[in-house]
């Protein structure tokens, strides 16, 4: 059935099972995606292939498509309503895969579709940890879609404190520290009492590189406070008004 769309269609017409598995527990759909065969992939999806069936490693066809950097198949699967938060045997979601493989386009597609940026793998690492580790260009996008910078892994570290300082590039450091500074400005006490928040506070305040960035952010916030409108409000109202929207998906910051 693999590779030839005409023959595959004929076999299906004669009753071939579209969800039959091989010894790896892979479906015909897996092989269509593995060979980047858009026509065959579309056929199997149209005939009702179950996109949420996983192989013996608990990997979905979406994991397979991302592993092959198969953007076309990823689009087809997302449009077909696949569960993008399925976890493999190591707890990695499709978003973990996309971040680790540094595929910005697929990462943005997953986030725009609603993929959860705070799902942990078996080591309790979220995609943000891997984004910092691999110097990903998607850190800002993760933050905008609700990634929690204060989440703690199984070693009691946040994504920032668990990543070697010298590894993180300047842009990503600026994104994380900027978000933390805004959070420090508007967060309620229950957030500030969380372990991850305290860890990041100590790290940022006691690291020269991080604290310098934070000081610049504080200066910019003070400049906003100094800007007065005719209504009597200052520009800091934009920070205050964002408070109702800012704690989304485990307190992920949504403004930059």
Curated annotation (Swiss-Prot):
Superkingdom of this protein's organism: Viruses
According to its UniProt entry, the protein's GO biological process terms are: positive regulation of protein catabolic process; protein ubiquitination
Q: Which InterPro entries match?
A: Ankyrin-SOCS_box_domain, Ankyrin_rpt, Ankyrin_rpt-contain_sf
Please provide the record's keywords in A-Z order.
ANK repeat, Repeat
ANK repeat start-end pairs: 1-20, 24-53, 57-86, 90-119, 123-151
Q: This chain belongs to which protein, by name?
A: Putative ankyrin repeat protein FPV231
Give the species: Fowlpox virus (strain NVSL)
